C-alpha cells in the first residue's frame, strides 16, 4: 500500500545539538512501554515478518530495506529483531566493509548491486550506498565532485530499482546527541558491546553538526515521492523497533501463504542389526552445566 512521505523537517531529534536547543534528550519524561507489552508485541510483529518472508518466497517479490542513521542510533538492534526468526536463505543482512582499492575504481553503486535480492529474497542493508552522503562527505573520503554526482544519480538509481520491481524502503534512525553520547559511554565499559565503539564513532561526537548538515542535504535530494525516507525517533530503543517494524509491514501488501500440512512418518521398528558404538570411543564435551548446578 502507498504510504505518504514523512516530513523530515519534524525530526528535530537529529539536528542541532541539545546544548544549543536547551534540552538533553527526547527520552526523559516520556512514558515508556512496559517490558511485558514490548515482548508480546515484538513477537507478534516477528510472526508477521515470517508471514512476509513466506509471501516473498512464494510470490517472487524482492524487498530491499535500508537502515541509516548516526552511530549508536539503534539500526543494528532493529535489524536483529526483524531477522531473529527469518530463514537466512530468504532474508539476509548486507553490511559492507570499507571499499577495497579495486572497488574504489568501480562505479560507486557497483558493489551494492551485487547484494541486491534475487526473486523471493529480502535484503536488509545495515548502512548502504548512502555512506557517500554521510561519513564519506563528512570525513573527506570522497571528492566534492563525487558527492555532487551521488546526489544527482541516487534518485535515478533508485528509480531504476523500483521500475524493475524491487520494493525499496528507506529508514533513518534519529537519535539525540545526549542519547548517543550516553550509549557510547555505556559501550565503553561493556565487555560484550565494547567492540561496537570505533574511532569513527568517537569522531562523530565532535562532528555532530557536520553530520546534521550532511543528513539534511541528503534528505533534500533523495527524499522523493517514489522513494521516500521514513524517520524513526530512536531515543527509546524499544519504541523505535516496534514503530519501525510495524510501519514497514504496513507499507507492503503481503498475504498469508497457505502452509502445507506436515505429517511425521512413523519411526521404523528397530531391526536389531544396529548397535551404537561404545561411549568411550567418542569424545564428548565436558558437562560444564553440572558445575553450575553444583554451586
UniProtKB/Swiss-Prot annotation:
- Region of interest: Disordered: 1-28
Tell me what the record says results from residue 69 to R: Partial loss of GTP-synthesizing activity
GO molecular function per UniProt: GTP binding; polyphosphate kinase activity
Give the compositionally biased regions (Polar residues).
7-16
- Supply the gene name: ppk2
Q: PTMs?
A: Autophosphorylated at His-115 and His-247 using polyP as a phosphate donor.
What does the organism's lineage look like at the top? Answer: Bacteria, Bacillati, Actinomycetota, Actinomycetes, Mycobacteriales
Q: Which reaction does it catalyse?
A: [phosphate](n) + GTP = [phosphate](n+1) + GDP
Could you confirm whether the keyword Phosphoprotein appears in this record?
A: yes
Substituting residue 75 to A results in: Partial loss of GTP-synthesizing activity
Report the protein name in the record.
Answer: GDP-polyphosphate phosphotransferase
Q: Which GO terms describe its cellular component?
A: plasma membrane
Write out the entry's keywords from A to Z: Kinase, Phosphoprotein, Transferase
Organism, by scientific name, is: Mycobacterium tuberculosis (strain ATCC 25618 / H37Rv)
Q: What is the induction note for this entry? A: Expression increases during the exponential phase of growth and remains at a steady level up to the stationary phase.
InterPro entries attached to this UniProt entry: P-loop_NTPase, Polyphosphate_phosphotransfera, PPK2-related, PPK2_PA0141
Q: What is the main EC category here?
A: transferase
Family designation: Belongs to the polyphosphate kinase 2 (PPK2) family. Class I subfamily.
PANTHER family found in the cross-reference section: ADP-POLYPHOSPHATE PHOSPHOTRANSFERASE, POLYPHOSPHATE:AMP PHOSPHOTRANSFERASE-RELATED
Q: What is the effect of changing residue 247 to A?
A: Partial loss of GTP-synthesizing activity and decrease in autophosphorylation. Loss of GTP-synthesizing activity and lack of autophosphorylation
Protein's job: Uses inorganic polyphosphate (polyP) as a donor to convert GDP to GTP. In addition, modulates nucleotide triphosphate synthesis catalyzed by the nucleoside diphosphate kinase (Ndk) in favor of GTP production over CTP or UTP. Plays an important role in survival of M.tuberculosis in macrophages.
Subunit details for this protein?
Answer: Interacts with Ndk.
Q: What's a GO biological-process term for it?
A: GTP biosynthetic process
